[in-house]
């Protein structure tokens, strides 16, 4: 009986060891205010959700209060711009949904803003956004326009967006006042010229504005190119000074796990949707390794999110607290933590307020 008891105890202990799970535990170092997590759902509009979230945090930082701004108003204007661009490029443009942060700030500067309650952008039978049909129609009409050598008639193009997103109100009432999109944007006090995009790739000269060669940069917007250490210093300084960061990067890695572990690590291990038995060893990152991954297409322009803070794990490793636009259903919070090495390796670009850039770097970039 004693032998059976000992064997049973040993078996239970073995099962316990085998089933043990390593859990990353985080302590917040600095977290800046952000609005509620939203859900882009079945759309390729992460660029807009991330940048609007970033601008909403800017309003909180500026003491302007909490506002829920309409992403679909911006998306609509972005589609109109890229349809025109594609036509003049004889069909060689990009009419897919993806874009970058500066396309959002361009739309705000030229077309204004609308609160979500005045333009939710869902004019079809769905509780969440779904642009599957809309995207197909945009591609079809764009191709026909090029084929016929004639732009899409304005009433047809606007009718398409009215059908899916709803008609844009000329005026609306918000918090007891009547606005147009332009007057509402002006009332918020945001200056789109204050926001700049930063990247770090060595095939371009540093401390100059460059055109980043990614498909979503269809309007050839410019990024300031800096060494990797400077880019990370900009992110850290922004968070420390109370700003947040719009982040564009690669999430196609098996080491990016939003759902189960809510963590992104720079490693070769597959951690996506898996229980972690041990702490994962990360790979170091250099300017050269980062460049190599960009040029062999390992690092690609996948997704935009919103960095709102910094945390450290139980071993003292730094992470960036990151707000996604996939709703709350996947992991309960809508946030996850990306390690410093992951951000070093997988960042395509960032958008920040120019005042959040360290003075010495800003001087080298000649940003006034």
Question: Where on the chain are the PLM-derived regions?
Answer:
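N-terminal regions that are enriched for targeting/export leaders
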Residues: 21-32
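Bacterial Sec-dependent N-terminal signal peptides
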Residues: 1-23
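N-terminal, post-signal-peptide region of Sec/Tat-exported proteins
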Residues: 43-75
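Second-shell loop/turn segments in exported
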Residues: 32-44, 88-95, 218-225, 234-235, ...
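Active-site signature of cysteine proteases
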Residues: 158-368
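Papain-like cysteine protease catalytic cores
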Residues: 71-175
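Structural recognition of the beta-strand scaffold that forms the well-ordered cores
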Residues: 48, 73-76, 104-106, 115-118, ...
């Amino acid at each position: 009986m004693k032998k059976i008891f000992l064997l049973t105890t040993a078996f239970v202990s073995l099962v316990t060891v085998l089933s043990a799970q390593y859990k990353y535990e985080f302590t917040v170092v600095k977290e800046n205010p952000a609005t509620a997590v939203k859900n882009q759902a079945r759309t390729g509009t992460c660029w807009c959700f991330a940048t609007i979230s970033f601008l909403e945090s800017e309003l909180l930082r500026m003491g302007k209060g909490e506002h829920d701004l309409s992403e679909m108003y911006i998306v609509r204007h972005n589609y109109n711009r890229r349809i025109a661009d594609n036509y003049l490029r004889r069909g060689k443009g990009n009419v897919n949904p993806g874009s970058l942060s500066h396309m959002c700030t361009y739309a705000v500067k030229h077309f204004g803003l609308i609160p979500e309650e005045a333009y939710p952008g869902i004019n079809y039978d769905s509780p969440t956004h779904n642009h599957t049909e809309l995207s197909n129609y945009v591609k079809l009409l764009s191709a026909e326009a090029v084929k016929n050598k004639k732009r899409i008639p304005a009433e047809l193009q606007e009718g398409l967006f009215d059908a899916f997103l709803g008609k844009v109100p000329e005026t609306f009432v918000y918090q007891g006042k009547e606005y147009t999109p332009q007057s509402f944007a002006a009332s918020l006090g945001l200056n789109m010229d204050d926001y700049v995009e930063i990247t770090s790739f060595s095939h371009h000269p540093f401390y100059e504005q460059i055109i980043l060669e990614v498909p979503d940069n269809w309007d050839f917007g410019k990024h300031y190119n800096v060494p990797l250490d400077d880019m990370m210093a900009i992110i850290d300084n922004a968070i420390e000074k109370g700003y947040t960061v719009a982040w564009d990067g690669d999430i196609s890695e098996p080491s990016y796990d939003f759902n189960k572990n809510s963590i992104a690590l720079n490693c070769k291990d597959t951690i996506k949707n898996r229980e972690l038995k041990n702490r994962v060893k990360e790979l170091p990152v250099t300017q050269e390794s980062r460049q190599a991954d960009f040029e062999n297409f390992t690092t690609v322009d996948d997704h935009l999110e919103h960095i709102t803070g910094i945390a450290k794990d139980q071993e003292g490793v730094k992470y960036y607290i990151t707000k996604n636009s996939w709703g709350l259903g996947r992991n309960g919070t809508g946030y996850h933590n990306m390690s410093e090495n992951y951000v070093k390796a997988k960042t395509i670009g960032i958008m920040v307020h120019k005042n959040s850039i360290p003075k010495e770097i800003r001087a080298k970039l000649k940003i006034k």
